[in-house]
Curated annotation (Swiss-Prot):
Site (Seems to be a necessary countercharge to the potassium cations): 248
Its job: Involved in the biosynthesis of the osmoprotectant glycine betaine. Catalyzes the irreversible oxidation of betaine aldehyde to the corresponding acid.
Residues that, per the record, bind K(+) 2: 246, 457, 460
Co-factor remark: Binds 2 potassium ions per subunit.
Annotated NAD(+) binding sites: 150-152, 176-179, 230-233, 254, 286, 387
Protein name per its UniProtKB record: Betaine aldehyde dehydrogenase
Residues given in the record as K(+) 1 binding sites: 93, 180
Listed pathway(s): Amine and polyamine biosynthesis; betaine biosynthesis via choline pathway; betaine from betaine aldehyde: step 1/1
Entry EC number(s): 1.2.1.8
Molecular function GO terms recorded: betaine-aldehyde dehydrogenase (NAD+) activity; metal ion binding
Length: 490
């Protein structure tokens, strides 16, 4: 029997058997063990979830703002009380170190839910005077039933990022987690129900993106889709959403982000920032700054500091709290990352450290890839142009500010960018010219609930987090009121 047993779908406030009974395995990438069997939803299950959501959403929307706020705050409290339990599940399902999942994944997700719970009473319309006897007022009304489709790298955090503003605005959500990492989304559904969310307001359908995800994007009963994933999948989501019922979409589609280091920096600080921008969560972060631009005069010294730090990484069993670098999320993804590493070698990049899968001792049965650093990279190399989503840093040298800005922007992506410098004028001057939606100066990676996150160009549509996201889960109704006489032309 697997550790977490059979996991059913979560529809209408309760665990529900799938129509087909088909299942798939959840695998711990640290050791290859099956930790759960998950039921796979089909079209009938999607219809059931939509019907449940349509029934529950008006009940939820009819509650006062303070009532909805209290229920979501209660869910925040439960999340924090169960932090360690949820972190252990997340670590087993994703391979992320327990030191990460305990301190980041549930914590930051709960923070976002608390943020939106506090904003609910502030969601309001306007009153617009027209003339003495007439005025217009507006209402922000929920969209109805919306869908969230998550990625595998931050399962519960993404589920909370998508559900928090949707629920706060009075919508119901059907959430499809990645089939690779589905367990904590189901636990979140339990928590919402325990907190008092009406049945049907948050449903979880497990299964493949090609099937369940497509059904959700095409379903006529769904008003909006929020998707996190790759560009190719995002294009399908947008096409399906537009081709069915002109659904609204929000999409975060990854990146190939530049981190620009200038010559005036403290090189130790710059190296620390580059390490976090590349190797946190084993490099499986959409905003990672994997194109590290360094002044040519500092390149050798910078490389030395990076190699020193890579050698200090503690790789191992992610359930060991001393470990800060675990396996990749799956064996399939490990193989994909290794193909990119092999490409870097073939195309002539200089390998400084790593460059291999790790198969010795306790790591033999896991999906481990060594932290890898290439230097003397060119802008046309595959490892520089394509999103790898793994622990692979590419170091590129440059000679002038104008040159590095041009090269940093020479990509179809535009999710994130960063600048490390002690010159405040230069920092803002350069950041303002970088084509990216999320930018950091002298830091990397933090995304507070108040901070809108999303990309330029092919990196996405719309934003998550921040006040504006809450508004995007509503539709504006305008009402004109006439207090005086009405004059007809007929």
């Amino acid at each position: 029997m697997s550790r977490y047993g059979l996991q059913k779908l979560y529809i209408n406030g309760a665990y529900t058997d799938s129509t087909s009974g088909d299942t798939f395995d959840a695998v711990n990438p640290a050791n290859g063990e099956c930790i759960a069997q998950l039921q796979a939803a089909n079209a009938q299950d999607v219809d059931k979830a939509v019907a449940a959501a349509k029934q529950g959403q008006p009940v939820w929307a009819a509650m006062t703002a303070m009532e909805r706020s209290r229920i979501l705050r209660r869910a925040v409290d439960i999340l924090r009380d169960r932090n360690d339990e949820l972190a252990a599940i997340e670590t087993a399902d994703t391979g992320k170190p327990l030191s990460e999942t305990r301190s980041v994944d549930i914590v930051t997700g709960a923070d976002v839910l608390e943020y939106y719970a506090g904003l609910i009473p502030a969601l309001e319309g306007q009153q617009i005077p027209l003339r003495g006897s007439a005025f217009v007022y507006t209402r922000r009304e929920p969209l109805g039933v919306v869908a969230g489709i998550g990625a595998w790298n931050y399962p519960i955090q993404i589920a909370l990022w998508k559900s928090a503003p949707a629920l706060a605005a009075g919508n119901a959500m059907i959430f499809k987690p990645s089939e690779v990492t589905s367990l904590t989304a189901l636990k979140l559904a339990e928590i919402y129900t325990e907190a008092g969310l009406p049945a049907g307001v948050f449903n979880v359908l497990t299964g493949s993106g090609d099937q369940v995800g497509q059904m959700l994007t095409e379903h006529p009963g769904i008003a909006k889709v929020s998707f996190t994933g790759g560009i190719a999948s995002g294009k399908k989501v947008m096409a399906n959403a537009a081709g069915s019922t002109l659904k609204d979409v929000t999409m975060e589609l990854g990146g190939k982000s530049p981190l620009i280091i200038f010559a005036d920096v403290d090189l130790d600080k710059a190296a620390d920032i580059a390490m976090m921008a590349n190797f946190y969560s084993s490099g499986q972060v959409c905003t990672n700054g994997t194109r590290v631009f360094v002044p040519q005069a500092l390149q050798a010294a910078f490389e030395q500091k990076i190699v020193e730090r890579v050698k200090r990484i503690h790789i191992g069993d992610p359930s060991d709290e001393r470990v800060n670098f675990g396996p990749l999320v799956s064996f399939q993804h490990r193989d994909s990352v290794m193909r990119y590493i092999d490409s870097g070698k073939r195309e002539g990049a200089t390998l400084l450290i790593g460059g291999c899968s790790l198969t010795e001792g306790a790591l033999a049965h896991g999906a481990y890839v060594a932290p890898t650093v290439f230097t003397h990279c060119r802008d046309d190399m595959q490892i520089v142009r394509e999103e790898i989503f793994g622990p692979v840093m590419s170091i590129l040298s440059y000679q002038s500010e104008e040159e590095v800005i041009r090269r940093a922007n020479d990509t179809e992506y535009g999710l994130a960018a960063g600048v490390v410098t002690q010159d405040l004028n230069r920092a803002h001057r350069v950041i303002h010219q970088l084509q990216a939606g999320i930018c950091w100066i002298n830091t990397w990676g933090e995304s507070a609930p108040e901070m809108p996150v999303g990309g330029y160009k092919h990196s996405g549509v719309g934003r998550e987090n921040g006040i504006s996201t809450l508004e995007h889960y509503t539709q504006i109704k305008s009402i004109q009121v006439e207090l005086g006489s009405f004059n007809s032309v007929f």
